[in-house]
Swiss-Prot record:
Lineage of origin: Bacteria, Bacillati, Actinomycetota, Actinomycetes, Micromonosporales
PANTHER family the UniProt entry points to: HEAT SHOCK PROTEIN 90 FAMILY MEMBER (PTHR11528)
Species of origin: Salinispora arenicola (strain CNS-205)
SMART domains referenced in this protein's UniProt entry, alphabetically: HATPase_c
Pfam families assigned: HATPase_c_3, HSP90
UniProt subcellular location: Cytoplasm
Annotated gene: htpG
UniProt name for this protein: Chaperone protein HtpG
Gene3D superfamilies membership: 3.30.230.80, 3.40.50.11260, Heat shock protein 90, C-terminal domain, Histidine kinase-like ATPase, C-terminal domain
Length: 636
């Protein structure tokens, strides 16, 4: 057979090599992956036949066949499903189009620990490539439903593969593994043995909705010849339809791996049934770790939808909001049409009811983890908290539930995050606002000038470092009757009435003393700021830049511009610390007749330092560094 030899895409080649030389101990899972792929192909064919009346295919006996040849040491997994075209074979097997692949491969190369390797591989879901853990050579023959000719693909996993047209190929896909020798030390079992196959199918794929068949030879009685009979290896019982107390944890785990293509066990299982005017069953899973494409627009979304045990679609976005896009599983609705489209699902009243119930159940499950299994909750929030917080922006119906499971870093304890209830319970007498600060990371926030007065007075501040935090705090506005207040916005006055009264005379003196400087600075920096004023929030820094209560923050400005939105630049407010030597020195220099150029340069340095201190960016870094260098040179 003449064919074309092609190279695997670079990242696919690297991942393939990791599988060929895998330190992953449980190599049995290769069969689970191949069966799962075959099951998907059968579901897709049935769905295509319902939606395309011109597709002439027989769906009366959709099944998976396992064929073994002890003498040739081969194992074949065959399905009569949708099949693939040549281009699809190249795209699906020859390349990897997942975001985050390079980073995953780097981590895999650096680790020599089997458990860590397993966890990292699980984040990717290598699927078909798992075959190379147990095979020296893999042959795939496929023909797409409705096409006349098929495709023959073959590789030994060494960086290249051959691909060629194939004739007289049955519809569907057959994957033949030329097995490596049995090696108990390397956990390579006899995968051509009937008993081994039975055990693996029972353990990993018993719930698959299509029959998994294997021809089994039975010895004849007395002098009669041995006979061959085809047996079905799996029970095909829909796991979600069984009572929860009849399902073993291991069964849940394997079903999760089937629907999610994850190799790790789920963090938590949500098994529920809806009865009444609209019946449905749902089996949902919270993963242990975030997928690599969690923040990718092309990432997988939603759960699988079935109608009366018939697969309808993957990634049913109508059943789960975007902020719960990591939830995996199955929803089996009893009263929907088999031909319902994605567009109609969005408007279907019954689906909307199911969606509301699913969301409430998932959030209630997380709340229960928070109360009773804090380690599991901590894992969940570390992996998915940044996504869940997206729900605080638009899901007003569940906002209270989301706020109950919210966890944020705080100045109260560097090691342990807090929830909003804990913050409120620790508030000082007379405190009416919940203070928060946003920034790229904890260190930047804690070192920001905006934090000085709060630190000096002992006020707890929430430290928000996810980009979404900038949006949800504005949208939520308050919690338990307490306003959410940014430490970098508006006027700050943390003094008690007694302290304020005692300091009033000094503040009035400062206002009078600095009036001229503030007016001059407002004019000198008119292109950068809209106001210059004295600060009550600074204790050690000379200056800081703040916004009014309803101003868009610089971080949000950057986010909107990155998304292609036109955002007018908001001029902010420069606050000065009247007790700082630099500020008082600038006042004296102006009073003593320093040159305008010298004063203006000092003003620019003061403003630039305030921007840098909060993690901001300078409009003209080269001018700033030139002025600073000249000033430093004069001191030497």
């Amino acid at each position: 057979m003449s064919g074309e030899t092609l190279e695997f895409q670079a990242e696919a080649r690297q991942l393939l090599q990791l599988m060929v030389h895998s330190i992953y101990s449980n190599k049995d899972v290769f069969l689970r992956e191949l069966i799962s792929n075959a099951s998907d192909a059968l579901d897709k064919l049935r769905l295509a036949s319902m939606r395309d009346k011109d597709l002439d295919v027989d769906t009366s006996d959709l099944h998976i066949a396992i064929e073994v040849d002890q003498d040739a040491r081969t194992l074949t997994v065959r399905d009569n499903g949708i099949g693939m075209t040549r281009d699809e074979v190249v795209q699906v097997i020859g390349t990897i189009a997942k975001s985050g692949t390079a980073e995953l491969l780097r981590k895999l190369r650096e680790t020599t620990d089997a458990e860590t390797s397993q966890e990292l591989i699980g984040q990717f879901g290598v699927g078909f490539y798992a075959a190379f853990m147990v095979a020296d050579r893999v042959v795939l023959v496929t023909r797409q439903a409705g096409e006349a000719d098929g495709t023959h693909w073959e590789s030994s996993g060494e960086g290249t593969y051959t691909i060629a047209p194939a004739t007289d190929v049955p519809q569907g896909t057959a994957v033949t593994l030329h097995l490596k020798p049995v090696d108990s030390e390397d956990n390579l079992h006899d995968y051509a043995a009937e008993w081994t196959i039975r055990q693996i199918v029972k353990r990993y794929s018993d719930f698959i909705a299509h029959p998994i068949r294997m021809a089994v030879e039975r010895p004849g009685s007395d002098d009669s010849e041995p006979t061959t009979e085809v047996q079905t290896l799996n029970s095909m019982k829909a796991l979600w339809a069984r009572p929860r107390d009849e399902v073993e944890p291991a069964e849940y785990h394997e079903f999760y791996k089937h629907v999610s293509h994850d190799w790790a066990d789920p963090l938590e299982v949500v098994h529920m049934r809806g009865e009444g005017t609209f019946e449905y069953e749902a089996l949902l899973f919270l993963p242990t770790h975030a997928p690599l494409d969690l923040f990718s627009p092309q990432g997988r979304r939603g759960v699988q939808l079935y109608v009366k045990r018939v697969f309808i679609m993957d990634d049913c976005e109508a059943l789960m909001p975007g902020y719960l896009r990591f939830v995996k599983g199955v929803v089996d609705a009893h009263d929907l049409s088999l031909n319902i489209s994605r567009e109609l699902l969005q408007q279907d009243r019954q689906i909307q009811v199911v969606r509301r119930r699913l969301v409430k159940k998932v959030l209630a499950t997380v709340k229960d983890l928070k109360a009773n299994q804090p380690e599991k909750y901590r894992t969940f929030w570390t992996e998915f908290g940044a996504v869940v917080k997206e729900g605080l922006i638009d899901d007003t119906e569940n906002r209270d539930s989301l706020l109950e499971i919210l966890s944020v870093a705080s100045t109260h304890d560097p090691a342990e995050p807090t929830d909003l209830t804990g913050y409120v319970n620790r508030m000082k007498d007379g405190q009416s606002e919940i203070y928060y600060a946003t920034g790229e990371n904890r260190t930047t926030i804690e070192n920001s000038p905006h934090m000085e007065a709060f630190r000096a007075k002992g006020f707890e501040v929430l430290l928000l470092t996810d980009p979404v935090d900038e949006v949800w705090v504005e949208r939520v506005g308050e919690y338990d009757g307490k306003t959410l207040r940014s430490v970098a916005k508006g006027q700050v006055d943390l003094d008690t009435d007694e302290e304020r009264s005692a300091a009033e005379a000094e503040r009035e003196r400062q206002r009078t003393e600095y009036a001229d400087l503030l007016t001059w600075l407002g004019s000198a920096l008119a292109d950068q700021v809209r106001e210059v004023r004295l600060s009550a929030r600074l204790t050690t820094s000379p200056a800081c830049v703040v916004g009014d209560a309803h101003d868009v923050t610089p971080t949000l400005e950057k986010m909107y511009r990155a998304m292609g939105h036109e955002v007018p630049q908001v001029k902010r407010i420069l606050e000065l610390n009247p007790t700082h030597p630099l500020v008082s020195g600038l006042r004296k220099a102006r009073e003593q007749g320093a040159t305008e150029d010298s004063l203006t340069e000092t003003a620019e340095l003061l403003y630039g330092m305030a921007l840098l201190a909060e993690g901001g960016e300078l409009a003209d870094p080269s001018r700033f560094t030139r002025i600073l260098a000249e000033r430093l040179a004069r001191t030497l």
